[in-house]
Structures are given as structure tokens and as C-alpha cells.
Amino acid sequence: MRKEIILTMTVLFLAVVFASPAAMAGTIKLSYANFPPAPTFPCVQMERWKVEVEKRTGGKVQINTFPGGTLLGAKDMFDGVMAGQADIGCSSMAYQPGRFIVTNASALPVGIPDARTGSLALLDLYNKYKPESFSKMKVLAMFTTAPSNIMSKVPIRTLKDIKGVDLRGSGGAAQVLAAWGANPVGMPMPATPEALQKGVVKGLLSSLETMKDFKFAEMCRYVTMTNTSIYPFAVVMNMDSWNALPMDVQKVMNDLIVEQSEWTGKYMDSHVKNSIAWSKKTYNVEFIDLDHTQKAYWDQRLSPISDKWIEDATAKGLPAEEILSSVKAAIAKHK
């Protein structure tokens, strides 16, 4: 009997000695992949979410973040998360317009005035329609960039100036560029600095925080203020990883969905203002404002984009006109 007690105690002792600290503490470790560099807004929001989750779960959850495509790239993100290569991932739906048809309606020229409004409108759109494209993932946040403007090496003051110019743009932004007569070149944002350096593109259409975050102001000394399409983003989680979480942890993450989406939009709007001021001061970037007549002329060219989206989405069995109306209603609600 005594030998059995000693043996049992020995086994328990060894189990304690060789158990990992995480296992002993019951820590839940999750990986979070992101594609752009660490200083950019998708990664800033990632780090903020990590801090909030770890704090609100009392250290029960530990998030390991992987910025800069170190775990998954932009175009591999959603499939990689579904396959379990990362527990959580963040990417832009603009890179796959045919896959995320409903949520990419937010990238149409629908008049989103700022990132906060766009982020909340996008989240409303997702919650209303629950697109099939997200059925195998848990959505943890959605947000948009601020409206896009043209950053270029050469001044673009009229539609004549933009004709045939190679400009980076993905998803809705690519359609906008084509409608204006530019030559849209699709590529992930992290590939754009090198493309600018090598002359593959002469500029891009995107939100202006990139002037500072990607140092585009070093090469693009002109910005044409078009204030048009946005880029929609989603933060998603592997469904098995989600289902394995305790209910109290799930509640923390669910409670953060709206808060995180709005926080990111507000951060983006503030950061854009800082980036504009920095670009002017550091590189004397010229910001070209279109007058009312010019702006109306540029915007008029974009009408067929929404018409084509309605046609294509309807052909796929989606209530396209209703979806577009829902986007506009959500924008008006959150302005």
C-alpha cells in the first residue's frame, strides 16, 4: 500500500514538473495573422484588440500576433484561417471581390464620408445579410479605410491627366480607376512601395494614412483629392478555434465586435489627418483639390460601376438593389 502511495505521489510530482506553464495556468494561446507591416492601421488595431482581450479575460487568453505577412499573406488570409494555419486573421475583402460580393458593396461609390461611418455601415451590412462567404469563419470585427485619393509621382489635375496612367488599385478602387481612364494595376499594398520604386506604377488610389505608414510621400509628391471608394476589411477566426473557447471568453470577443470596429474607424480618421499634415511638412506634397464642377464630372464617370455590380450580383441570385439600398441607409444612419 505504501509503495502504491509513493508511486502515485511520484507520478503527480513529475506531471507538475514537466507540465508547461501555459497548461498549468490554463492559458489559451491564439495566433493572429496580418499582412501589412506593423505600423499600419490593420496591425495597430490588431495590437489594440490583443491587449483588450488579454486584459478583459484576466490573462486567460494570450494572443501571439504576426504582422507583415510572416504567417499568412493578404490573398491567403481567409483560406489560411479556415484551414487552421492561424487562429485569427485580418485582410481586405477587396482582394477577392467575386468571393465577398455582399460586403464589397461597401466599396462601391456610395458616398462613405469617413472610416468610422464606413466601418459601422459595413458591420451593419454583414449582420443583416450574413453572407455565405463567412459561414465557415467567425467574424470578430469589420472596418473600412477612409475614402480613397490619388497619390502619384506626376500631377493629376484633370481626367485628361489620368488617362492611361498605371495606378495601383484593387477591388472597387480598380473599377474606379478604370472608369476614370487610368490603367489599374492590382497588387497587395505591401508590394506597392517596390512597384513605385521600379516604375511599375506611377501612383495608387487608396486612403491617405499610407502616405506616412508606407512612406509613399517620399515618391508620390502629388495627391488628387477625389474622396471616393474605400477598402473593406474583416477580422475572422477559425471556427474550430472559436468553438473551443470557453463561453466567458467568447462573450469578451463578442462584446468587442462593434467597439473594435468603431475604434478602428476613428483611429483611421485621426491618423489620416496626421498623415496629411506630415506629408505636407516633411515632403512638401501638393494636395490638388477638384472644384465642384470637376468633382461632379469625375463622379459622373462612376455611375456604371454600381449598375454593373447590381447586374452581376442579381445574376448570382442576390437581392442586389436591396443590398445597395441597405448600404446607403447604414451610411446615413452612422453619419
Specify the residue positions occupied by each region the protein language model found.
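P-loop NTP-binding core
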Residues: 122
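Absolute protein N-terminus
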Residues: 1, 25-26
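C-terminal segment of classical bacterial N-terminal signal peptides
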Residues: 15-23
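Bacterial N-terminal signal peptides that target proteins for export
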Residues: 1-10
